[in-house]
């Protein structure tokens, strides 16, 4: 963002509500538990949290974010999640009728939810779904760098799936919402019930 100093930016905050009715004007994402940060990708990668404070992110995770980003410079909004556990894999056993579950150890991951800048081009005034499309084009998922999933329909059935995975809250975002760094945006709502 040529006209805005990146170090002065902070993540946008969602408004909190107890309930929200499904609407075609919104998407639904899981509310990840962890440390929210804006990650700058460039010569010196860094993470900035609320109130513009530096987030002490693991160096190897910042390096993984840089490696998985196809742009020279970018600003990503996301969550550093500690203790992330994937679903266990079913592995074939020695015998024809044998199988076992391979448990995957917990690890730290970065889950990207938005893209605010790419190669000096600000995306703050770009609608959310277009920013998500560009995020998917710029950031390649890996075991340690993830893109948050989202849906536009079927909130309740997807909510059931997310609850089974341990999510207790959800974020609904207006599809045409713009990004307002450091502000609370009424078009992003964190909810407990759908």
Over which residues does each language-model region extend?
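Catalytic cores of nucleic-acid ligases and guanylyltransferases
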Residues: 1-194
């Amino acid at each position: 963002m040529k006209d805005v100093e990146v170090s002065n930016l902070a993540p946008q905050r969602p408004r909190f509500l107890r309930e929200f009715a499904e609407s075609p004007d919104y998407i639904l994402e899981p509310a990840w538990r962890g440390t929210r940060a804006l990650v700058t990708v460039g010569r010196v990668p860094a993470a900035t949290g609320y109130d513009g404070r530096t987030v002490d992110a693991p160096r190897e995770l910042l390096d993984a974010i840089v490696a998985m980003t196809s742009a020279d410079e970018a600003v990503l909004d996301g969550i550093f999640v500690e203790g992330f556990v994937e679903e266990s894999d079913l592995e074939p056993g020695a015998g024809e009728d044998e199988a076992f579950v391979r448990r995957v150890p917990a690890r730290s991951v970065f889950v990207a939810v938005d893209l605010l800048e790419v190669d000096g081009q600000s995306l703050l005034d770009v609608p959310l779904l277009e920013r998500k499309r560009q995020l998917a084009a710029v950031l390649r998922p890996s075991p340690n760098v993830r893109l948050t999933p989202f849906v536009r329909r079927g909130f309740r059935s997807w909510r059931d799936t997310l609850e089974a995975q341990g999510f207790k809250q959800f974020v609904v975002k207006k599809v045409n919402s713009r990004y307002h760094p450091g502000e609370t945006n009424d078009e992003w709502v964190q909810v407990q019930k759908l």
